[in-house]
Amino acid sequence: MIREERLLKVLRAPHVSEKASIAMEKSNTIVLKVAKDATKAEIKAAVQKLFEVEVESVNTLLMKGKVKRHGQRIGRRSDWKKAYVTLKEGQNLDFVGGAE
């Protein structure tokens, strides 16, 4: 069993993009920014416990940080982990429904 304190640190924020919106509509998949050291099992447990939905599968990938310039200085954004969480049939989770 994963401690509740760890579950709260696993999920960082929803990742809102055009691709994420299409994934939600077509395949009932939500896209989340998660902790870089989070495992698929931890992500699944955190989503099920915090949002009270049933998760079918979790796919993860590491996103490389972009190189950005600020004047003549060159910097780099941090690498981060993205998770595609597919919800079971009939389950629904809406992050941006109240933003209209």
Swiss-Prot record:
Keywords: Ribonucleoprotein, Ribosomal protein, RNA-binding, rRNA-binding
Any GO CC annotation of this UniProt entry: ribosome
A molecular function GO annotation: structural constituent of ribosome
One GO BP annotation of this record: translation
Pfam families in the cross-refs: Ribosomal_L23
Stored InterPro entries: Nucleotide-bd_a/b_plait_sf, Ribosomal_uL23-like, Ribosomal_uL23/eL15/eS24_sf, Ribosomal_uL23_CS
Protein family (similarity comment): Belongs to the universal ribosomal protein uL23 family.
The protein's role, per its UniProt record: One of the early assembly proteins it binds 23S rRNA. One of the proteins that surrounds the polypeptide exit tunnel on the outside of the ribosome. Forms the main docking site for trigger factor binding to the ribosome.
Subunit relationships: Part of the 50S ribosomal subunit. Contacts protein L29, and trigger factor when it is bound to the ribosome.
Protein name, per record: Large ribosomal subunit protein uL23
